[in-house]
Amino acid sequence: MSEIASLQDTIFALSSGRLPSGVAVVRISGPKVRFVLETIVGSIPTPRYAAYKLFRSRNGDPIDRGLALFFPGPNSFTGEDCAEFHLHGGKAVVEKLLSEMGELHGCRIAEAGEFTRRAFSNGKMDLTIAEGLADLIAAETEGQRRLALQVASGTQRELYTEWRQRLLRARAFIEAELDFADESDVPGSVSEQVWQSLALLKSEIENHIASGKRASMLRDGLHVVIVGAPNAGKSSLLNFLAGREVAIISEEAGTTRDLLEVKLDLGGIPVYVTDTAGLRETDSSVEKIGIERARARMADADLVLLLEDMNDPIAVASDEIPEALWKIGTKADLNAESADCWTYRISTKTGEGLDQLLTNLQNFAEEQIGQIEDAVPTRQRHINLLRSTVTEIDRAINGTNLPLELRAENMRLASQYLGRITGDVDVEEILDVIFSQFCIGK
């Protein structure tokens, strides 16, 4: 469906979530909102005031009683005329209302993210705010909520807009020197000041890119991998961290052959902990696959917990162990000796050391992410476009043997890359990808 055709339709959808529920909210947007209101509830409510109404079918049969609200454009979420129906959240009730609305000429069910896409198309928000809203809806931890709300509040947009304006001003100075070099009111060698300001801007963007790793960890979670020899207590530790039995515990070595993952919320930070197959030499083809997966997951981990039975320690090859490693001695209840070779001593039988380990896992997660107070890039597409921006700025600064016209073009390209982040420039090809992340009704 073309963008132009879809904007001519009036769209509607359940926006309040899965049925049944106590209350259901149906959202409507488009040129026929007033017609829908008159058809379903008999009149158009006073803008922004809830009106208690009887919802009727096209034939006048009652459907339910509830609230109707009207938000005339352009001062609405989408910038168009919008309305909401608040009714009882019974499945049959909502389906009947949606069915009746779908029979009205020019009205159809909204596609995923279509309300937000219309808000973007009508200038009510930029792409970073839309992405922030998507992250806010998907947030599962307090840290994710805070980060998403920050982005949805426009902090990224303000920063990228300011950088883009600085680039445009710098380019204007260069083009003024090109066009009016003979005029007395244009300072000579103004371009030297421009290159200094661009060097500062480049440094700011590079620092901003570096902060993206912390945002990525908060958005996508930290990954902790439990490794060790068979029967080192890996599955027992996973069960403790999960607070339930997710892994089979057995005296038989090699019980765990696939990756088992649980998600923890540690101080508002999502942490994924993975139990892996015991690392050893084996003739079992299935177990070998599990060991290969364990080693691959280790390579991508933010932290590795290397477990060793303190009564029977079996070393794991050092070239398999990443830098971020905690060496944990297990079955401390069977070993009274203290040894400095282990970062922690734990016993899943008596609970020794487990609470301290969990506390330190949370401290580690908080140290990795830190306090995110300033705007940070939250998507890989932001990082890619920011890197392209830096590349063009660098070419402009260091192209001392090139004509000013070419260096000004590098600055124009840098400005365009920044504009693509916010959606101000040439982003049609990525809109479907971004807005498909929303659910129906958003």
Swiss-Prot record:
One example of a Gene Ontology biological process annotation: tRNA wobble uridine modification
Residue ranges occupied by any TrmE-type G domain in the UniProt entry: 221-366
Keyword S-adenosyl-L-methionine in annotation: no
Binding-site residues, GTP: 231-236, 250-256, 275-278
Gene Ontology CC, one term: cytoplasm
Keywords: Cytoplasm, GTP-binding, Hydrolase, Magnesium, Metal-binding, Nucleotide-binding, Potassium, tRNA processing
Pfam family, any one: MnmE_helical
Cofactor(s) needed by this chain: K(+)
Compartments in which it is found: Cytoplasm
Keyword Transcription: no
Annotated (6S)-5-formyl-5,6,7,8-tetrahydrofolate binding sites: 27, 84, 124, 442
Primary residence: cytoplasm
Binding residues for Mg(2+): 235, 256
CDD domains found in the cross-reference section: trmE, TrmE_N
Gene3D superfamilies linked: P-loop containing nucleotide triphosphate hydrolases, Probable tRNA modification gtpase trme, domain 1, tRNA modification GTPase MnmE domain 2
EC code: 3.6.-.-
Superkingdom per UniProt: Bacteria
Family note: Belongs to the TRAFAC class TrmE-Era-EngA-EngB-Septin-like GTPase superfamily. TrmE GTPase family.
Assembly, per entry: Homodimer. Heterotetramer of two MnmE and two MnmG subunits.
Role description: Exhibits a very high intrinsic GTPase hydrolysis rate. Involved in the addition of a carboxymethylaminomethyl (cmnm) group at the wobble position (U34) of certain tRNAs, forming tRNA-cmnm(5)s(2)U34.
Classification via HAMAP family: GTPase_MnmE
Full protein name: tRNA modification GTPase MnmE
Organism: Brucella anthropi (strain ATCC 49188 / DSM 6882 / CCUG 24695 / JCM 21032 / LMG 3331 / NBRC 15819 / NCTC 12168 / Alc 37)
